[in-house]
């Protein structure tokens, strides 16, 4: 189990069998959203200072990549089928990163959204076969709060 400790600039790693706790120090700050690729031993972590999408090897605890990302990231999801990472941030964008191999990632898309829209949900393929990405857009003086729905495509 992985737990963000943003005030300490660390990730706690809890062994569920032994209850031992290890800590991975970070060189980046304000680590908040995380997603796990358990099959390939990769942990994806969004940071605020600076805005990065960091990739960790869960077997060694080493950071293997850190790419510039959306500011004020709140949610981050891993799409195992497409080998993609989706990251929503209050800066007003959804960043999509593509994994080319276990050590290499690149920015695939930077989709404009709405300033302050940073809370998101991605649940993979739904009952009707569509894959949806949901984004909560906060209320403004000229309109109420909304949920924007995106269809994930190859």
How would you label these PLM feature ranges?
Residues 1-154:
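Predominantly soluble domains enriched in secretory-pathway, periplasmic, or organellar proteins
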